[in-house]
Amino acid sequence: MPPFEVKIEKLIYGGDGLAHHEGATVFVPFVLPAERVAALPIEQKKKFIRAQPETILEASPERIAARCAHFGVCGGCNYQHIPYSQQLEFKAEILRETLRRIGRIDWTGAIATHASPPWEYRNRAQWKIRPAEGAALDVDADEDDARQEAGRAKKEQAKLNIGYFRANSTALCAVEDCSILAPSLLTALLALRQALARGALPLALREIEVFGAEATAASPAKL
């Protein structure tokens, strides 16, 4: 299905924009309400379409430049194109709609938001490990079987990369930096990248989940 134009009606839980096209509900990430978008379908069902924003045809005046170079490809976060104060407003409205739609609670009162720092706040992450894009094995055919197998494993492991899944995909988005990770977790991510490059991690490893506590005078950083 070729790209088609939609106008984003609102944001929903998870950060996707919601629109409609020829009777189908359309979900598009990394957009804002009232934006006109050329949407490229990546999954099509009878009643809904998941799409990627191929082009922002008419941008919201609220849109800002994302801090992270991976934003728009990486599926690790959804709101960097929105000012932080407005992110909180959208999330409060999403909660209000969820209460109404699922809980049958029509809450018209204020919803207090508890803001955290907009950057370097995430102290839990799930990183995926997959072969680097374009990686191919190159093992000397003259080596004996044992050495060849060891060399193959070492080279294959060294060509793995670490990051997050791409948005709406199970393909890897390898990252060298992450603006929302707590500093202790970013340090761990970079150390794991180096360990992969050395072939120092188990070949079968495909996912790492981490939880970090930031260092204080009374409590050193731990992972």
Where do the PLM segments sit?
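Accessory RNA-recognition modules of RNA-modification enzymes
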Residues: 1-223
